[in-house]
Amino acid sequence: PETTVETINNGEALKVTFDSGILFATNSSTLSDASRSALRKLAVSLNENPDTDIKIVGYTDNTGKVDCNQTLSEKRAKSVYDYLMVDQGVSGRRMEYEGKGVHDPVASNDTPEGRALNRRVEILILANEKMIQDAQQGTLK
């Protein structure tokens, strides 16, 4: 799958996972046209739900040097962050990004299919304090 959405933390957050193959060319942190389209759709939802915080996390497979993969994962996460903020108007105050490189794989790096699954960007969408307070007070819109 190119993009998956799932609930995590007992339903307290959403995790949107983008296959890095649709976001970036190999060894690149420049967003592809297809990725801009997918991220544009996500940005509409993010802008319609301003009481959420966003964490963008980049990952790689284990091919190549660990430090190069770490840097690449950080640059890819920052590319998504910059696009959402600069091009789509999502507030930078509600977003953070990080790269995890080869850490936290979701599949075995022993097969091409597993490595493809590990090359990804995850966007975590979490309720912020205002949304939590509104939910507790019964005023959530």
Language-model features: locations:
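Periplasmic peptidoglycan-binding/tethering modules of Gram-negative envelope proteins
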Residues: 1-53, 126-141
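A short, charged
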Residues: 41-71
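Periplasmic OmpA-like peptidoglycan-binding domain that tethers envelope proteins to the cell wall
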Residues: 59-141
